[in-house]
């Protein structure tokens, strides 16, 4: 075996190696300041002298600070342990249900809770690295060279505020930009009268909605005449829909937590500055997941703002599986053992379920994740084909009649209540089929003369008209109110017929037809897997009643087809 010298001083040091070791040494400066204290702890541990706990500084309440982890968006409660003013250890907060199950009662004394640690994932543990990273930005950096030149200099916070607000010749020292006059926020803060801004916005909305070119041009000229004293505040007076120059200020953020978001996005950007442009991370994260949840949670009800019955009340949220009570969990593009919302909360419950034999899990993910390594079955479907996988399962489940027919037959709230169900679906609601064969809107009782529109009065005293939906019972159309709590209505599931000359299909029929556009073999080919993979998961998924769930946060949504893929899985 050849000998390798450890004292080779002639080998050149690469830039990458230099930066890596420099970062290590920089971060080590903090650790070095605590080295003696850590050595003392180790020495006492080896000598078994750490007990009783009063001699162990990190187990004292005064050495601990309770906070929230922001290493990811879960926001687990944490307990930071401080030694001589430096954070040396982070554990889970025992008061938090995210990190300890069952969590300590809030009435527990901090002197007692100091001895109890919750769990925390490696991301949370790495909070120390984030806090003391030598490359952490703690000052404002200003570009000191051409764009892309990676040259920066630090400036004071006060100077940054002044330059951002007032603009000016901010890059006099950069070649080619000596005469570049940069606009500041004061230059973009053009339209300042809220009453005028509201009136202009309403007028611009009419222009935007008008599609006929001649009428549109006439509305633009009318707008310019009505607001002639304020045209200088617009981005382009000939295109009022672009809005005021205020809209040229864009607040583009990654993730902003509650409180900060309401202030920065709403109160400052929109309300105070008057810009409509506050934009988050959208589908690159999980925007499709949120907006599918919003679309699917919309209910037909009276809308207090618009003073009429409409689809309303949808929330930007998503569903996740009950890891503590399920018998079968299907994780699609999700790995709670290393990410997700969040390992401290979910990983322990899943692990207990697997160890106790209560739970079986399967994973659909192109990557063999930590979660997939513990799964009954891992299916490496191609990225972006998750919707095809869901439709393949849907086709098999409907054709094999392995769905909860009684639950799906509930057309309204009263029917669900009668069956002891907390929710109901639109599976049996009839949908009108257009002349081109495509589904249109839901059939209403007034469409077929079943009953007239119903005059109702809202809680705020507003009178409005409502129109009942329709389902089939024993082949006969029946009108119903989805929110009716007194008269239960159950409908037929798979419907493809005509009602008084109107071609209709049930919502479940349309779902089955969509899933039947391809054979299971064809769906599998799209995913790059076998048809048996789809069948095996569909069979297992339908073998546990209501104790089976699919968890799709968030890989399914992170594609351009994310909205529709999430829709397929939620269906």
Q: Language-model features: where?
A:
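Conserved alpha/beta enzyme-core scaffolds, especially Rossmann-like or related mixed alpha/beta domains
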Residues: 151, 178-187, 498, 505, ...
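Secondary-structure capping and boundary motifs in well-ordered enzyme cores
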Residues: 322, 360, 367, 385, ...
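Short acidic (Asp/Glu) and glycine-rich catalytic loops that position anionic groups and cofactors
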Residues: 369-374, 513-518, 546-552
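Conserved thiamine diphosphate
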Residues: 322-325, 329-332, 511-527
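N-terminal export/assembly segments and adjacent metallocofactor-ligating motifs
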Residues: 2-483, 489, 530, 569
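Ligand/cofactor-recognition surfaces for anionic moieties
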Residues: 487, 495, 499, 503
């Amino acid at each position: 075996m050849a000998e390798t010298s450890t004292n080779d001083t002639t080998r050149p040091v690469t830039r990458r190696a230099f930066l890596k070791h420099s970062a290590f040494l920089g971060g080590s400066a903090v650790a070095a300041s605590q080295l003696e204290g850590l050595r003392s702890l180790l020495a006492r541990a080896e000598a078994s002298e750490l007990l009783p706990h009063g001699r162990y500084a990190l187990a004292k309440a005064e050495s601990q600070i309770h906070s929230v982890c922001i290493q990811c968006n879960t926001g687990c409660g944490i307990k930071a342990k401080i030694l001589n003013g430096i954070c040396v250890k982070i554990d889970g907060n025992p008061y938090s249900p995210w990190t300890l199950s069952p969590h300590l009662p809030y009435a527990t004394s901090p002197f007692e809770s100091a001895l109890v640690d919750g769990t925390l994932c490696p991301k949370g543990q790495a909070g120390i690295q984030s806090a003391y990273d030598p490359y952490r930005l703690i000052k404002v950096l200003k570009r000191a060279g051409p764009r892309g030149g990676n040259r920066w200099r630090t400036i004071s916070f006060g100077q940054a505020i002044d330059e951002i607000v007032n603009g000016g010749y901010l890059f006099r020292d950069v070649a080619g930009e000596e005469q570049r006059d940069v606009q500041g926020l004061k230059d973009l803060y053009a339209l300042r009268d809220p009453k005028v801004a509201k009136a202009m916005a309403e007028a611009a909305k009419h222009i935007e909605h008008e599609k006929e070119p001649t009428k549109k041009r006439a509305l633009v000229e009318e707008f310019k005449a009505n607001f002639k004293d304020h045209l200088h505040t617009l981005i382009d007076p000939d295109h009022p829909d672009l809005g005021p120059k205020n809209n040229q200020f864009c607040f583009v953020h990654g993730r902003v937590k509650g409180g900060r978001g309401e202030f920065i996005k709403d109160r400052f950007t929109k309300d105070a500055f008057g810009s409509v442009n506050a934009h988050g991370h959208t589908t690159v994260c999980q925007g499709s997941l949120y907006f599918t949840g919003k679309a699917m949670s919309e209910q037909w009800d009276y809308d207090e703002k618009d003073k009429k019955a409409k689809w309303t009340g949808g929330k930007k949220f998503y569903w996740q599986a009950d890891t503590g009570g399920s018998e079968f969990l299907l994780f699609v593009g999700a790995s709670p053992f290393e990410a997700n919302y969040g390992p401290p909360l979910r990983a322990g419950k899943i692990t207990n379920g697997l160890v106790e034999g209560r739970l079986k899990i399967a994973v659909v993910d192109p990557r063999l994740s930590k979660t997939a390594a513990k799964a009954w079955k891992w299916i490496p479907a191609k990225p972006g084909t998750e919707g095809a996988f869901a439709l393949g399962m849907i086709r098999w489940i409907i054709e094999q009649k392995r769905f909860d027919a009684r639950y799906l037959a509930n057309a309204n709230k009263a029917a669900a209540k009668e069956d002891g169900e907390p929710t109901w679906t639109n599976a049996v609601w009839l949908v009108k089929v257009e002349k081109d064969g495509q589904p249109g809107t839901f059939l209403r009782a007034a469409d077929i003369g079943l009953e007239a529109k119903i005059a109702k009065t809202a809680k705020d005293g507003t009178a409005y008209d409502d129109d009942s939906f329709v389902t089939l019972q024993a082949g006969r159309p029946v009108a119903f109110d989805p929110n009716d709590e007194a008269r239960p209505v159950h409908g037929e599931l798979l419907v493809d017929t005509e009602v008084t000359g109107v071609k209709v299909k049930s919502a479940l029929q349309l779902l089955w037809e969509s899933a039947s556009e391809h054979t299971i073999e064809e769906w599998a080919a799209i995913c790059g897997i076998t048809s048996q993979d789809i069948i095996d998961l569909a069979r297992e998924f339908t073998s546990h009643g209501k104790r089976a769930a699919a968890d799709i946060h968030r890989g399914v949504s992170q594609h351009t087809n994310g909205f529709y893929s999430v829709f397929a899985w939620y269906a």
